[in-house]
Amino acid sequence: MLKPLGDRVVIELVQAEEKTASGIVLPDTAKEKPQEGKVVAVGTGRVLENGERVALEVAAGDLIIFSKYAGTEVKYEGTDYLILRESDILAVIG
């Protein structure tokens, strides 16, 4: 399993829609980059200037919305993940 460091979070992407509302099938090049994902692992938190560690506000299992071009895409054991900083997370869904 991937274990992120510091204030980083590993998410599994929620796949973009394959069809439009009217039923048109979209090719991969026309799909919007996903901005939703499920948190699968979180780092230990960020360290403040005084050395204190601050825990992350998200937890494994949270469904999140993140910045469109944030993070680094990685493939691990056949699954696509995105590793991003907590500051790139815009909201938790639900």
Curated annotation (Swiss-Prot):
Alphabetical UniProt keywords: Chaperone, Cytoplasm
Organism domain of life: Bacteria
Keyword Cytoplasm: yes
Disulfide bonds: none
Any one GO molecular function term: metal ion binding
Similarity remark: Belongs to the GroES chaperonin family.
Reported function: Together with the chaperonin GroEL, plays an essential role in assisting protein folding. The GroEL-GroES system forms a nano-cage that allows encapsulation of the non-native substrate proteins and provides a physical environment optimized to promote and accelerate protein folding. GroES binds to the apical surface of the GroEL ring, thereby capping the opening of the GroEL channel.
Name of the molecule in the record: Co-chaperonin GroES
Organism: Bacillus cereus (strain ATCC 14579 / DSM 31 / CCUG 7414 / JCM 2152 / NBRC 15305 / NCIMB 9373 / NCTC 2599 / NRRL B-3711)
Organismal lineage: Bacteria, Bacillati, Bacillota, Bacilli, Bacillales
